[in-house]
């Protein structure tokens, strides 16, 4: 696809210096150790946000929720402090033999607002029928998070609101 451009190099330097705006920034990063640690910083995510075109999205893996739950929670919290919409999702990664968490981050694009029918229609329009994994149902499915992952990725204010609603129901039932 002529719209696709793959850039390999110093991501921090590139994102800091570019004046371009991107519809999508997909980060396939090393673990956040050593030199790669800066690529997981709030500063870098802010710079990525600035490099997005209106309606654009940043997509990245946020870790293995079973093996490193603290990393998933930390990154989700950091991203929620920068982007208006952060939608974590999970999938099994055969290479690692584990479920991994990713996130779509944007100020306008909400991938959960797309229905299975809309996804299937777009796949058909773009003549992508040979896809082996992705379809409308898998789109909806990857965003259906198990409770233990929800607990990791929900920002504290949402947890407080949810807890308040539950307590309100309990109080009302007790009266």
Predicted regions and their residues:
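Short, solvent-exposed coil/turn elements at secondary-structure transition points
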Residues: 12, 92-94, 108
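Short strand-turn motif at the edge of the Rossmann-like AdoMet-binding core
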Residues: 30, 61-65, 91
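Conserved Class I S-adenosyl-L-methionine
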Residues: 45-46, 71-93, 103
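A short, hydrophobic/aromatic-rich structural module that often spans a beta strand
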Residues: 55, 80-81, 113-114
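Acidic/polar loop patches that form or flank catalytic/metal-binding clefts of enzymes
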Residues: 60, 85-90, 112-116
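SAM/dcSAM-binding transferase cores
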Residues: 101-175
């Amino acid at each position: 696809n002529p719209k696709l451009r793959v850039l390999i190099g110093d991501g921090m330097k590139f994102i800091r210096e570019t004046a371009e705006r991107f519809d999508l920034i997909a980060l396939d990063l090393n673990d956040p150790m050593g030199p790669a640690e800066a690529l997981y910083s709030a500063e870098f995510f802010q710079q990525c946000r600035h490099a997005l075109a209106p309606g654009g999205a940043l997509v990245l893996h946020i870790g293995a929720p079973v093996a490193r739950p603290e990393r998933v929670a930390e990154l989700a919290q950091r991203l929620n402090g920068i982007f208006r919409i952060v939608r974590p999702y999970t999938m099994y990664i055969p290479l690692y033999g584990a479920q991994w968490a990713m996130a779509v981050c944007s100020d306008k694009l909400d991938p959960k607002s797309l229905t299975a029918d809309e996804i299937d229609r777009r796949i058909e329009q773009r003549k992508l029928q040979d896809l082996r994994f992705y379809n409308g149902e898998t789109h909806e499915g990857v965003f259906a998070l198990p409770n233990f992952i929800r607990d990791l990725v929900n920002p504290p204010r949402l947890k407080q609101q949810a807890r308040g609603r539950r307590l309100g129901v309990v109080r009302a039932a007790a009266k």
